[in-house]
Amino acid sequence: MLRMRVDHVVYAAEQDGARATADRLAAMLGAEAFDGGVHPRFGTRNVIIPLADERYVEVVEVLDHPASDNAPFGQVVRARSEAGGGWLGWVIEVDDLSAQEERLGRQAVAGNRHRPDGVELRWKQLGLKGLQADPQ
């Protein structure tokens, strides 16, 4: 049986940037936001608001970097932020990504994030084209 769970939700930064946006949201949630790091392949950076059970809100903004113009995620974040920011999408973790690749007829793409402490996180993802066509 396929196991899946909500991993996090994504919120595009409002006009005053990811940090200020995340601080406002965190205050409403009774949480404390922290810098998440940079997505070099996407030309974005994020601020994390931790929630219960290892879930979180990711507040993301584009960087002034060519990757944000070329990567679908960077394009989606830029468009949503330029429209005032707000909820962008949600991320589901699955235990068998290959089954989802087969079901959708697409290969997952690599993603990574460099945290401020130097740790690099890596993952594979599907669905950015769908998010681009129909932002949440």
Regions of interest found by a model, annotated:
Residues 2, 4-16, 37, 45-55, 57-58, 66-103, ...:
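Vicinal oxygen chelate
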Residues 39-42:
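A short beta-turn/loop motif at secondary-structure boundaries
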Residues 2-36:
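Short, extreme N-terminal leader segments that mark the start of a protein/domain
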Residues 61:
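Conserved active-site aspartate in kinases
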Residues 33-34, 44-46:
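Short alpha-helical segments and helix-capping/turn motifs at coil-helix boundaries
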